Amino acid sequence: MTQPQPAPREPKSRLLHDGRDMFWSIGPLVLACVVLAGVLGMCSFAPAGPGEGRVPNFDAPAALRADADALRIPVRVPALPEGWRANSGGREGIDGGRTDPATGQAVRAVATRVGYLAPNGMYLSLTQSNADEDALVGSINPDAYPTGSQDVAGRSWVVYEGGEDAEPVWTTRLDGAGGPAQIAITGAGGTDEYRTLAQATQSQRPLTVP
């Protein structure tokens, strides 16, 4: 006798096919949204601007000693009060920046620069160089011009201004056993910060270059 055949399965609903297709269509989009939400969750909105970040650790005394040895110019390590922090530094050249006393010709000058943060967070940079005054100031702000002077513990610093939004440049020439050095200070600090950095620098003897 012929065995009864099982009834054929009913075809899957088209809705199931559509649902599977929809899953594979929107799955990557959902995953992308989850990733984006995670990234945004690690961010924060600061309407007043970025907060205080970590100050880079820069060993100014070691860097200045290395610069004095490499550049062969008088370099001083400022004796700054507590709360001041060095955060950057480097060397640079100034083409035609000094006058050779033997020939009277303009030759290349060199400079070392260290950036400091005052206790109030304001940034100032200290540049020490064998350049002539006008060349050193011009390397910092080509539009600067002298507007007066400031007396710091009996030493005169020439003050240069360079426009409404430009930061002032204070400069003086310090003599020492290793020869003269032109010093320049500029930055976002006020007069008190300029004077503190100026006094901390001029009060020190230049490093001995072997």
Predicted regions and their residues:
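A generic signature of intrinsically disordered, low-complexity regions enriched in glycine/proline
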Residues: M22-S25, G104, T147, G179
